[in-house]
Amino acid sequence: MLGAFLAVVVLATAGYLGYVAARRSQPVTLPTPTGPYQVGRTIFEWTDTARTDPLAPQPDTARSLSVWLWYPGAPEPGETTAPYLPGAWSGLHIGGPAGLGESGFGVVHPHAVPDAPVADGRFPIVVLEPGSGFAAPQYTALAEDLASHGYLVAGVTPTYSANLTVLHDRTVTASKAGLPSAFDNSDLHGPAAEQAAARLLSVWVADARFAAARLAALDASGRFAGHVNASAIAFLGHSFGGAAALEACRAEAACVGAADLDGTQYGEVVRAGLTKPMLLVASENSCVTGDCTGSADASGRAAARRLVAASTGPVWCYEIGGARHIDFSDYDAYYLAAPLRKLLALGTNGRGVTLTVVSAYLDAFLDQITRGTPQPLLTGESRPYREVRIQHTPGSETSPPR
C-alpha cells in the first residue's frame, strides 16, 4: 500500500512540475499601453560627481545610477520591441528552485521599441523609484503606459539598494547600508527603522532630483532636444520609493505633484505635509492612506494621517481591494506557480488587473496636475473599477477608521 501511495505522489508531483514548466514557457505580454503614443525606451548610466555614495562598500565612490527612460516614440512600422530584461538584467529573475515557478524573462514581452525616434511634442517628466530591493525595469508595465500618455518616465534603480542593478555591463548587488535589515522588522516606524529610513531617504531623494535634472538637460541637444517640459516634474514610487517620491516633491521646487503606491511614509514630508498635489494608492487594508483595521501597522497609519492632515495641496487616496503589496510591480503580470504566488503574497485580482487599475489612476492624476484636464475617475463620477474604494478626495474629510 505504501509503495502504491508513494507512486501516486511521485506521479502527481511530476505531473505538476511538468505543468509548471509548460506554463512558465508560455509567452506573457505586459498590459497594453492605453495612451495614443507608441513607446520608446533607452537606457542611461549617469554619475553624480558632486556626491560621494554613502551606500557603496568602497569609500570615496561617486554615486552612479542606471536610469531607464520610457518615452512617447515614433518608431517605423514593424520595428522590433525591446527585450524585457536584456543581458545581465536577467539576473533579476528569482534564483534557485523557486525561480522555476516564474515566467522566464525571455518570454515576457514589453511594448517599447529600443531607441525609437521621439514623438512630436514637449512632454512632462515623471521620475519613478522602485521599492526597496527592486529595480526600475520591474515596473515596465506602469512606465510604458505612462509614456503612451505623453510622459518622459525616468526609472531610477537605486544602486546598492536594489538586489541587482547593471552598470557598465556588470551586475552590482545590494550592500548592507543600501538594504538595511531594520526594514525586516514588523514595526516599520520603530527607532531602528526610522533611523535607517532617514539615512536611505536622503540618498534616494537626491537620486530622484539628480535624474530629473539630467533629464531636463536633455532638452538642450540630441535626440530629446525640444521634447522635454522641465517645468512639469512629477515623482512616483512604490513602497519605499513612494516615500522617496513624496519627500523629493517636497524638496524640489519644480515638482508639480507626487504619487505613492503602497509605500509607508517617512521623512520631513510626514511632519510638514505636501503643498503640491498628492496621490496615495493602497493595497487592500494597507495603512499607507491612513485607513486600515485590525492588526495592521498602527504606526504606519498614524504617519499617513499626519501626512494627509499636514498637507495643504490636494490629496487623493484610494484602496484597491484584492491587491497586495507586490501587485504594483510587473510581478502582477507574470505567470507564477501557486506556491510562489503565496510566498510573494500576491493578491487575488487576477494577472494584470491591479496594474491596469493603478495605471488608470496614475494617468488621471498626472493628466490633471500637468495638463489641467478634469478627471471624473479621480472624483468618483466615473467608477469603472469595482476593486477601488475612494478614501479621500480634495475637499472631503479624511476617512474614519473602519
Describe the role of every protein-language-model region.
Residues 20-126, 347-351:
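Domain-level recognition of soluble alpha/beta enzyme cores
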Residues 77, 107-166, 288-290:
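Short substrate-entry loop that stabilizes the transition state in hydrolases
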Residues 256-325:
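The feature captures the conserved acid-bearing segment of alpha/beta-hydrolase catalytic domains
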